[in-house]
Amino acid sequence: MIKKLIDPELLANLEPSIDFDIWADLPTTRIKYTAMQQERISEFQPLDHVPFRDHYLSAMQNNHEIRVRVYHPTNITGPAPALLWLHGGGYVLGTIDTEVPMMQLMADGVGCAIVAVEYRLAPEHPFPSPLNDCYATISWLVKNAESLNIDSGRIAIGGISAGAGLAAGLALMVRDRGEFNLSFQLLLCPMLDDRNELVSTHFPLTGISW
């Protein structure tokens, strides 16, 4: 159990949260992770003035469809700046369906459109599949900015954890291909070290996999 690794002085703050372990059984982990996230977001009231719409794009390979969710606050007049957002989950977990409250709050608070990407997950879809999904999405976003009421000159990328790692890779891909420019990148606790060989990765030995 993860909670047994927490300092007793801090444990009380975690009591209201759902207990969650990362097991070697990935299908079970995904089911429990999604259930945990769904329970967490059920506490939030939706923001009616930040509606969203799903779009389906063709990926660069294997005739795969990429689901993209665009949030656009109704109180923004004129073309809005946009943040392409990539969810976390260790590259193996996560979905845009469990991030609705966070995306609505971010779009409302910042005053921008949010474009959330349902990129493919490992191990079923190894690198570079998720990165290709992200590049296909931002290319679509730039090309369709006018119809989406988005300012193509103010498009940023960002993500959290594994999503931030993808955002960093996407920024490099955009730079190298030179097809368009980005305003900035927002990396929250980015997962960047592909070696994953810090002491904390292996100690204490709990049987928990990452």
Residue locations for each model-derived region?
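Alpha/beta-hydrolase active-site loop
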Residues: H125-S147
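Short beta-strand immediately N-terminal to the catalytic nucleophile in serine-hydrolase-like folds
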Residues: A156-G159, L188
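A glycine/proline-hinged amphipathic helix-loop "lid/cap" segment
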Residues: M1-V70
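Gly/Ala-rich beta-loop-alpha elbow adjacent to hydrolase catalytic centers
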Residues: G159, G163, A167
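Hydrolase active-site cap/lid region
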Residues: L172-W210
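Short beta-strand element of the alpha/beta-hydrolase
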Residues: V68, P79-G89
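Short amphipathic alpha-helix adjacent to the substrate-entry channel of hydrolases
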Residues: I96-V117
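Gly/Ser-rich "nucleophile elbow"/oxyanion-hole loop immediately N-terminal to the catalytic nucleophile
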Residues: V142-I157, R177
